[in-house]
Structure formats: C-alpha cells, structure tokens
Amino acid sequence: RHEFNAENIKPRDLYETYLPPFEALVKEGKVKEVMCAYNRFEGDPCCGSDRLLMQILRDEWGFDGIVLSDCGAIADFYRDYGHKTHPDAESASAAAVLSGTDLECGSSYEALVEAVKQGKIDEKAVDVAVKRLLTARFALGEMDEPEKVSWTGIPFSVVASAGHDSLALDMARKSMTLLMNKDNTLPLKRGGLTIAVMGPNANDSVMQWGNYNGMPPHTVTILDGIRKALGSDDRLIYEPVSYTHLRAHE
C-alpha cells in the first residue's frame, strides 16, 4: 500500500465501481472530513492527486471540508520504502497542500516553513488549508466554553444506547458483500459443525478497538461471537498460537 500505483483505470470503471461509495458519503452523508490514501493513483500519491482531491472531490462533488492524510502518507512521497515521487519533505508537503490535503497525520508538514522560504509553495496556499482547519474547529465548538457546546454534555448512556447498538449492527450487516459462494458453502448447515478458530486475536477484545478509538461499554470477542452462534451439537476448536508469526521467525 505504501508503494502501489493504481493505474490505467478506465473512466467508466472509476466512476461506476470505485467512486460511488465516496460520492454518496460526500453528497448524501455530508461528511466534513475525508482521508486520502497511501497508494498512488495514476502515478500521483493520492494525497498529492489534483484529479482526486481537487477536480473530483471539491469541484465535481462540491466538498468544502477538510482533507486529512493517512498516517505517514506524506512521508511516503519521498522515503526510500515509499513512492519516491518527490526528493524531500519540503517538496512533498508543498505538493500535498497544493493538491488539497489540509492536514497531515505525521510530521512532514513541519517542513512547510522551509518550503515557503524555498518558494515551493506560496504562503497564501497554506492559508487556504489553515482557514479550512480553523473553520472546522470553530464549528466543533473547540473555541467555546464546554457548557456552551451542546454535545459535550451527552451522557455515555445515550452514546451506548440500545438504539445505537441496533443501528451499528444493521450497518455492519449491510456493509458486507459476498463476492463468491463456491459450491454453495454458505449459508452453513446448522448442526454437527466442527469450527476451527485460529490465532490470539480471536480472543482479544482490545485488538478489535483499533488504535484510535472510543471506549465501548462491552466487547464481544470473535471467539465468543462464534461460540454464541453455534448449537449444542456443534464443536469448536480454538488454537491461540499465531502460526504466521512463528514461521516469520523460523
């Protein structure tokens, strides 16, 4: 993902296969922040792609919010194990901002001061990104007293309500796509099943949260979820050892 170049994508495939989910989120969901990806698109890193971030996202779809890079994506522009499309952090940061990436998850944008001094980007272009960022922070109420911001007082009981749990479950179910069902394997026949569950993460609740997350009131592990779904005459075999990890160190 840090070196891959998605290229020679036909316009019809782009607009009918890849873009519709994102377009719906922008136009119908009214999202205020979009994250640009690690990989390249037709030779340009996604976070430095005028085609994606300016022409399509902002001009065609009318997006006026913030574009944030995935973590370390700007450094991929110039580091050896990345795309190597730019010689240094100054060039990479300037290109990203000029292409519409307002905020970086990382430290490459620290080079923007030097990039301005070197003439690689005008200070007015940086101001455009800063204005978008400050507009969002004001809209979130970050500059107001907490008691004046309506959503700072929402209790956890509302956030983790039964209605929200039900909605999250429904969204998860509808997000799944079955690409192939060889030999009609699914749905699994109930009764007399033997299920093997492999790896330590199957029984690790914290792993499921991700690395920037809220604190859920409870977590059902993958292993517990499978156990709950099985019948009394089904058999479950759980092996917590990570065989991939072992092979990597042999």
Where do the language-model regions lie?
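Glycoside hydrolase catalytic-domain context in secreted enzymes
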Residues: 1-247
